[in-house]
Amino acid sequence: MKKIYKEQYRQIGLKIAYYRKLRGLTQEELAEQVGVTPAFIGHLEAPNISKALSLDTLFDIATVLEVPPHKFLCFEDP
């Protein structure tokens, strides 16, 4: 049975937005440094969209934002 992790992806996106803003980066700047499109970052951060991403991309984002990857994977109950 395949489980859909919509809420977890939403929380990851909100954390990406939080740490990106904390570092003073725009979505465009983060996208350029990670090697993805600004639209991809926008979709990740949108609270009403559950966009999946690979661990490689998550690790790249964590590296650019200087945040340990596990910070993105600690979830609150919905």
Features from the language model and the residues they span:
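A detector for short, charged/polar N-terminal pre-domain segments
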Residues: 1-11
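Short basic helix-loop element that most often maps to the first helix and adjoining turn
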Residues: 14-33
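Conserved hydrophobic/aromatic packing and binding residues within compact polymer-binding modules
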Residues: 16, 30-31, 41-44, 72
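Helix-turn-helix DNA-binding elements, focusing on the entry/boundary residues of the two helices
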Residues: 16, 27, 38, 55-58
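Recognition helix of helix-turn-helix/homeodomain-like DNA-binding domains
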Residues: 35-52
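Short, basic-rich loop-to-helix N-cap that marks the start of a DNA-contacting helix
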Residues: 48-63
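Short C-terminal boundary/hinge segments that cap the last helix of small helical domains
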Residues: 66-78
